[in-house]
């Protein structure tokens, strides 16, 4: 992209988990935070160099997907390694139930296209709980407080 000199745009998909954290989601949260950090650094690097390439990071909350059925893709020899304890199973079921009320993927795609056209870095679908969670985490950081455990 840089060598060609043409305009372009990169969209990296993270998650609300790239901007917040939740119990029983540590590995997922870490990977999504990494995507956000990579995207922010890439955005700044491209700005400094004056490259005609934009960057956006998609941080959706709940989207109607099969993410909670991903174990179906686990190799048989690793099936036991993927077994969750009772508390994690309860959390997983609650998340599955909430996902059913999420955004349809087509609506998220429309928001990504709008974000690119508007030159927005953060593409965060307008779910009130997403913005609230981001605000709570930011306030905890500003006040150097221990992380707030969100309920619900």
Which residues fall in each region the model found?
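Short-chain dehydrogenase/reductase
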Residues: 39-40, 109
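Residue(s) in the substrate-gating loop at a strand-loop-helix junction
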Residues: 15
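Active-site loop immediately N-terminal to the catalytic Tyr-X3-Lys motif
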Residues: 20-27
